[in-house]
């Protein structure tokens, strides 16, 4: 059965109705899931297996039958571990129907159908009794309900319900306990992801400073956690202000509460500085004695950094304090972790708070609109003074006396740069009400509300009256649009340039004047694992899961790239970067598709995991901004990526085939095509068999 789905096209800006298979969402969720990453997490799998064996043994030693409840079973892996360890029966709960169906097949293939019952329900809907899903309460509770924040996937309510209704009072739990850790730091880099810094512009009249409105400075920021691969943040980017502090623990073998709570830890600052950011992670102990431990600690907090396990399904958290506060070395302070049923947040206090008073402190929520419009990488991009200087220098070369500028980018400061650098009149278009209001406030606090005209409408709908009857001599864009997911989605600027053609003066300048799509073939240190088949996991056959992921990838995404912030995922270039397509913004969009075919020679040995693609914008003939590679690769090929942008990764089909040898074909062929009508860029990269 086919269904019609309405989707906003991020490149053309139009609303499209697409005919999709009724199971499209299922396939998309499977294709973009972390199931493969979890199966490749050997440390996790081994520790769970050890903990399960120990729990089953403790129950058997008491002379009891081992009845297991496995919540969030996924592939059924942990249930199969339990049965192999000697459990008498296992009830495996999985709410996602396609996953539950796969678990049934995997359990059957491994010969455990007589000992494992897969139940396709949310655990809070599971019943116990003669006519229930379980005949009696279980005495072993196994779960994998955790996300990077520990409780963000609803672990606390699920545990709370399970203890009340599904498991015995003295049950064994795997994991047995979780502990959340925090470390207070000062970090201009990370703080720049949360606050708008003053922006400096050198002009003929001296330095001008663009300042943020007071409501932006007071705003506590976005409520969602910032989860990143903290091991990729250089220690030079932050100053440690506290030891690693154990903030709170949850004992999963006892009744768990999902009620709001707070936990305070007094500490003595290791250094004086501005307390801005809390780095946080957790570990889980699989047994009551804490001998079997799985930790998410970054390398500097590991007892043995050499044994660091890479994983993408669990990372580390960055929390921003509502406001930065000075701390003095040796002067005690109190860090407080607050949580409700799904979220964690932090505050810094002078004394230990009364538990009851702070338990219900309201979770920080953005009230300035900026954190709803700009994500954290975008804040970092706007705060990048070198980037601002680059745009300012380019503007100086194209601005002329009497220039009438039209700026088209979401929530951009370009219009203010243009004004300060001498434009006679500046218009800026903000499509959303939120960005319109935000920019009005920023202009007002900088006394520019009468200098820059803000137009709240889609740029395609601009009229001569909106521009006060004037013709535009300089069309500006970064370009940046909040709807863009992949690098080339910002080609929406080209569509806007085409639609406003009648408002441009003869000889009008467009900045950027052109864009180009670039690619390089890479070998990832670890990211390949999220798309690599597992086959066998701790002795269990999970090929069915591999096939399921491959089918979902083939369903829609086999020829699509996916966005990843590659500064978090180290890789080596195996080829030289190559320009694939160019787009001339000085001209309207052509009617016919643009295609590029070619071959990329592999100049370094390694496993070709995929092609990385990014956009470069030629602001002027002598000035270019890259959203991808920002430095030439070093001798070994190590890549340095723009930290404010996501790059596009096209995983080669060989990433899904472990049989391809390391030193296989020495070139990659490609076909890339831009379709002006839809704004789509279709592509195919494949290893060329140069050996035959």
Swiss-Prot record:
Record's GO cellular component terms: cytosol; fibrillar center; nucleoplasm; nucleus
EC number: 2.1.1.321
Subcellular localization, as worded in the UniProt entry: Cytoplasm, Cytosol; Nucleus
Record domain SAM-dependent MTase PRMT-type: where: 14-345, 358-684
Keywords: Chromatin regulator, Cytoplasm, Differentiation, Methylation, Methyltransferase, Nucleus, Repeat, S-adenosyl-L-methionine, Transcription, Transcription regulation, Transferase
Gene null: resulting phenotype: Mutants, shortly after birth, display significant reduced body size, reduced weight and shortened fifth metatarsals. They are subviable with about 45% of the expected number of mutant pups at P14. Surviving adult mice exhibit increased fat mass, reduced length and limb abnormalities. They also have reduced bone mineral content and density. Knockout mice show sexually dimorphic phenotypes, including changes in bone mineral content, bone mineral density and fifth metacarpal length that are only significant in females.
InterPro entries: Arg_MeTrfase (IPR025799), MeTrfase_PRMT7 (IPR014644), PRMT_dom (IPR055135), SAM-dependent_MTases_sf (IPR029063)
Catalysis: reaction(s): L-arginyl-[protein] + S-adenosyl-L-methionine = N(omega)-methyl-L-arginyl-[protein] + S-adenosyl-L-homocysteine + H(+)
Keyword Cell inner membrane annotated: no
One Pfam entry name: PRMT_C
Broad class of enzyme this protein falls into: transferase
UniProt GO MF annotations: histone binding; histone H4 methyltransferase activity; histone H4R3 methyltransferase activity; protein-arginine omega-N monomethyltransferase activity; protein-arginine omega-N symmetric methyltransferase activity; ribonucleoprotein complex binding; S-adenosylmethionine-dependent methyltransferase activity
Gene Ontology biological-process annotations: genomic imprinting; methylation; spliceosomal snRNP assembly
Presence of the UniProt keyword Methyltransferase in the record: yes
UniProt cross-references to CDD domains, sorted A to Z: AdoMet_MTases
Entry annotation: catalytic residues: 144, 153
Superkingdom of the source species: Eukaryota
Record-listed Omega-N-methylarginine modification sites: 32
Main location: cytoplasm
Self-association state and partner proteins as the record states: Homodimer and heterodimer. Interacts with PRMT5 and SNRPD3. Interacts with CTCFL.
Biological role: Arginine methyltransferase that can both catalyze the formation of omega-N monomethylarginine (MMA) and symmetrical dimethylarginine (sDMA), with a preference for the formation of MMA. Specifically mediates the symmetrical dimethylation of arginine residues in the small nuclear ribonucleoproteins Sm D1 (SNRPD1) and Sm D3 (SNRPD3); such methylation being required for the assembly and biogenesis of snRNP core particles. Specifically mediates the symmetric dimethylation of histone H4 'Arg-3' to form H4R3me2s.
Family the UniProt entry places it in: Belongs to the class I-like SAM-binding methyltransferase superfamily. Protein arginine N-methyltransferase family. PRMT7 subfamily.
Protein's recorded name: Protein arginine N-methyltransferase 7
């Amino acid at each position: 059965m086919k269904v019609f789905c309405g989707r906003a096209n991020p490149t053309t800006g139009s609303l499209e109705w697409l005919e999709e298979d009724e199971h499209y969402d299922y396939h998309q969720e499977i294709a973009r899931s972390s199931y493969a990453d979890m199966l490749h997490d050997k440390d996790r799998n081994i520790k769970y297996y050890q903990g399960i064996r120990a729990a089953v043994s403790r129950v058997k030693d008491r002379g009891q039958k081992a009845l297991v409840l496995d919540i969030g079973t996924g592939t059924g892996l942990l249930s199969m571990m339990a049965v192999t360890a000697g459990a008498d029966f296992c009830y495996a709960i999985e709410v996602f129907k396609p996953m539950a169906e796969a678990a049934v097949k995997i359990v059957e293939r491994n010969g455990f159908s007589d000992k494992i019952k897969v139940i396709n329900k949310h655990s809070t809907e599971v019943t116990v009794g003669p006519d229930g899903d379980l005949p009696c309460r279980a005495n072993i509770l196994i779960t994998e309900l955790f996300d990077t924040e520990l409780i963000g996937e609803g672990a606390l309510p699920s545990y709370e319900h399970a203890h009340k209704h599904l498991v015995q009072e003295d049950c064994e739990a795997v994991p047995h306990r979780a502990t959340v850790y925090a470390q207070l730091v000062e970090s201009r880099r990370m703080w720049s992801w949360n606050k708008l810094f003053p922006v400096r512009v050198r002009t003929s009249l001296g330095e001008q400073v663009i300042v943020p409105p007071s409501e932006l400075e007071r705003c506590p920021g976005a409520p969602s956690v910032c989860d990143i691969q903290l091991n990729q943040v250089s220690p030079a980017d932050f100053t440690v202000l506290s030891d690693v502090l154990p903030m709170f623990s949850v004992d999963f073998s006892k009744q768990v509460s999902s009620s709001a709570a707070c936990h305070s830890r007094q500490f003595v600052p290791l250094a004086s500085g501005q307390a801005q950011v809390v780095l946080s992670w957790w570990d889980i102990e699989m047994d009551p004695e804490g001998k079997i431990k799985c930790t998410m600690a970054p390398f500097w907090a590991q007892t043995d950094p050499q044994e660091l396990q890479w994983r993408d399904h669990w990372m580390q958290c960055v929390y921003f304090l509502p406001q930065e506060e000075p701390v003095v070395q040796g002067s005690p302070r109190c860090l407080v972790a607050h949580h409700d049923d799904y979220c964690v947040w932090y505050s810094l206090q002078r004394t230990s708070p009364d538990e009851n008073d702070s338990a219900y402190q309201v979770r920080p929520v953005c009230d300035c609109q900026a954190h709803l419009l700009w994500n954290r990488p975008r804040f970092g991009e706007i705060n990048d003074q070198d980037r601002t200087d680059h745009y300012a220098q380019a503007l100086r070369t194209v601005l002329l006396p009497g220039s009438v500028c039209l700026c088209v980018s979401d929530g951009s400061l370009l219009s203010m740069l243009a004004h300060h650098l001498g434009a006679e009149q500046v218009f800026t278009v903000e499509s959303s009400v939120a960005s319109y209001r935000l920019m009005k406030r920023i202009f007002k606090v900088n006394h520019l509300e009468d200098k820059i005209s803000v137009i709240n409408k889609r740029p395609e709908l601009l009229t001569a009256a909106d521009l006060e009857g004037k013709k535009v001599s300089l069309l500006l864009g970064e370009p940046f649009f909040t709807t863009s997911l992949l690098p080339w989605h910002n080609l929406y600027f080209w569509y806007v340039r085409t639609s406003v053609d009648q408002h441009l003066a003869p000889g009008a300048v467009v900045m950027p004047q052109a864009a180009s799509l670039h690619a390089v073939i890479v070998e990832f240190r670890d990211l390949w694992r999220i798309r690599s088949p597992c086959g066998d996991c701790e002795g269990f056959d999970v090929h069915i899961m591999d096939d399921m992921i491959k089918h979902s990838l083939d369903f829609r995404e086999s020829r699509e790239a996916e966005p990843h912030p590659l500064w978090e995922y180290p890789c080596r270039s195996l080829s030289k970067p190559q320009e694939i397509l160019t787009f001339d913004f000085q001209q309207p969009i052509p009617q016919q598709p643009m295609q590029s075919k070619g071959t990329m020679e592999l100049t370094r040995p390694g496993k070709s995991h995929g092609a990385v693609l990014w956009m470069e914008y030629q602001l002027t003939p002598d000035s270019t901004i890259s959203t991808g590679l920002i430095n030439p690769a070093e001798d070994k090929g190590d890549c340095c990526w723009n930290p404010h942008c996501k790059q596009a990764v096209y995983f080669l089909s060989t990433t899904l085939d472990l049989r391809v040898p390391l030193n296989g074909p020495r070139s990659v062929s490609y076909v890339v095509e831009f379709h002006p009508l839809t704004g789509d860029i279709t592509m195919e990269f494949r290893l060329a068999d140069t050996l035959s």
